[in-house]
Amino acid sequence: MDHLPIFCQLRDRDCLIVGGGDVAERKARLLLDAGARLTVNALAFIPQFTAWADAGMLTLVEGPFDESLLDTCWLAIAATDDDALNQRVSEAAESRRIFCNVVDAPKAASFIMPSIIDRSPLMVAVSSGGTSPVLARLLREKLESLLPLHLGQVAKYAGQLRGRVKQQFATMGERRRFWEKLFVNDRLAQSLANNDQKAITETTEQLINEPLDHRGEVVLVGAGPGDAGLLTLKGLQQIQQADVVVYDRLVSDDIMNLIRRDADRVFVGKRAGYHCVPQEEINQILLREAQKGKRVVRLKGGDPFIFGRGGEELETLCNAGIPFSVVPGITAASGCSAYSGIPLTHRDYAQSVRLITGHLKTGGELDWENLAAEKQTLVFYMGLNQAATIQQKLIEYGMPGEMPVAIVENGTAVTQRVIDGTLTQLGELAQQMNSPSLIIIGRVVGLRDKLNWFSNH
């Protein structure tokens, strides 16, 4: 993060703009809207500045820039078309430890001005760090269309209710659930927009007096195979509303960065063949946090119901009467194959696909005869350590040794690595790869050279 986003309280504080043209005017509007006591210095001014000065909204100082203008300032903006003058203003401000923005020269500035969506008291700022103002503007326009104009009224009304809500609801969890109900209540929003005081009061009383469910809840969320862009919209919404996030090793750092900043994070460290936290203990963590009235997200790589033991976790919650829901994720088979240029099914090569766990332990034996059949694709999860056994068994039951195979490591991530070969090489190939990896076996692997798109990007 190159810049710390902050919102400055400038009401009745001295600010200086050096420049009297159109760019300076745009900056002046922002500072006036923020209530600043504004001085503008320039050799000449466009008419708007004169009109503001005549209305007593700001002070004009006509003439060359003098550093003494900064003596009482909280904040300054250099907005002239003279680069040398802008640099001089910046250096003079820096020597006085005054924040200074230099228009179109972010490297010379001690702060930058973001694009702003104003739904006061709700403010949203979008910045590209000065590298691409056009991109920031485009993002602002998209956000403008998503945020209702009356959102500011709802936020302001919420501020008026804070004292009462604090008295009414004892815990932070109860208050948060109340606020979530209020902010998504369309009737209240419309009543505020129409200034319908009767409807505002009725809706508010109904929301406050409705009994809250004191039980917490658990949401099982599939994080997808790695690329944060593959996280579903609903999954994103859930992790941003969570009080507690219980996650494992397969959840990428990019996805973890999307979690609510004040949420508790509990790492349970699961990976193929190794469990830092036993499954039963994970079940109890979910149960314990939910019983405290918290909203818990169990965040799993891929899809929670495909070799994720999500069903076992939900059985524990169900037996304890804890509400739960599931947000599916893109499973590793889909993500890794797509990012490797390997279609799992193909009219000419595979009419079915099988997802198989590579955990060949506790004496369990797979149906190798059916797995060795033609016209299908096999995807082995967590099969890296058993690759030699998989190779031996499939050949033993009749699969041709020249059957194409691929191993995908860190699928969909920027660190993705793929090697391919034939079934007779599978055990040897596996020794070159690290977990997490996925094994794909079938004729469709032969299409990889033609369809591989990700490595070219």
Curated annotation (Swiss-Prot):
InterPro entries: 4pyrrol_Mease, 4pyrrol_Methylase_sf, 4pyrrole_Mease_sub1, 4pyrrole_Mease_sub2, CobA/CysG_C, NAD(P)-bd_dom_sf, Siro_Cobalamin_biosynth, Sirohaem_synt_dimer_dom_sf. Pfam families: CysG_dimeriser, NAD_binding_7, Sirohm_synth_M, TP_methylase. S-adenosyl-L-methionine binds at residues 225, 301-303, 306, 331-332, 382, 411. Residues 216-457 are annotated as: Uroporphyrinogen-III C-methyltransferase. Gene3D superfamilies: Cobalt-precorrin-4 Transmethylase, Domain 1, Methyltransferase, Cobalt-precorrin-4 Transmethylase, Domain 2, NAD(P)-binding Rossmann-like Domain, Sirohaem synthase, dimerisation domain, Siroheme synthase, domain 2. Pathway: Cofactor biosynthesis; adenosylcobalamin biosynthesis; precorrin-2 from uroporphyrinogen III: step 1/1; Cofactor biosynthesis; adenosylcobalamin biosynthesis; sirohydrochlorin from precorrin-2: step 1/1; Porphyrin-containing compound metabolism; siroheme biosynthesis; precorrin-2 from uroporphyrinogen III: step 1/1; Porphyrin-containing compound metabolism; siroheme biosynthesis; siroheme from sirohydrochlorin: step 1/1. The modification Phosphoserine is found at residue 128. In the N-terminal section; belongs to the precorrin-2 dehydrogenase / sirohydrochlorin ferrochelatase family. This is Siroheme synthase. The lineage of its organism: Bacteria, Pseudomonadati, Pseudomonadota, Gammaproteobacteria, Enterobacterales. The gene is cysG.
